[in-house]
Curated annotation (Swiss-Prot):
Motif KBM in this chain: 1-21
Summary of the function given for this chain in its UniProt record: Cell-cycle-specific regulator of classical non-homologous end joining (NHEJ) of DNA double-strand break (DSB) repair, which can act both as an activator or inhibitor of NHEJ, depending on the cell cycle phase. Acts as a regulator of DNA repair pathway choice by specifically inhibiting classical NHEJ during the S and G2 phases, thereby promoting error-free repair by homologous recombination during cell cycle phases when sister chromatids are present.
One Pfam match: MRI
Signal peptide: none
Motif (XLM): 147-157
Effect of mutating P14A: Abolishes interaction with XRCC5/Ku80 and XRCC6/Ku70 and ability to inhibit classical non-homologous end joining (NHEJ)
Annotated positions of the N-acetylmethionine modification: M1
Designated name of the protein: Cell cycle regulator of non-homologous end joining
GO cellular component: cytoplasm; DNA repair complex; nucleus; site of double-strand break
Protein's organism: Homo sapiens
Keyword entries, A-Z: Acetylation, Chromosome, Cytoplasm, DNA damage, DNA repair, Nucleus
Biased composition (Polar residues): 123-136
Amino acid sequence: METLQSETKTRVLPSWLTAQVATKNVAPMKAPKRMRMAAVPVAAARLPATRTVYCMNEAEIVDVALGILIESRKQEKACEQPALAGADNPEHSPPCSVSPHTSSGSSSEEEDSGKQALAPGLSPSQRPGGSSSACSRSPEEEEEEDVLKYVREIFFS
């Protein structure tokens, strides 16, 4: 009988007391907080990558692209120079090679490098005075010019 009385006592509770219990059961506050807290770190983790992308303007992108291209060209030249210095055969060491990165529109540079390939035994200081302007400049200047040409083609055409 006592169990019946306890059941009846729960049914006899005042409405304000049952409403409070019903509120706790119907809308638990812990579940939404957990979801919100889980969503905040995910959003915070995404922010740095997004900010990095949006902070770069066109000038910065061009600077980074130039830096990468120049660095890769320097590495290529560094790998080629020891091989060229060790080679005694003139056919293995062309004095002024045309880089694979030059555009097809520079036919005069290709013709000039062909003229210098005719005299492979001469060092750069022994070449005739009428050598091309592409080889009279330093290799770094030529690399920068090629890189700038590509950047202009990509971003400004």
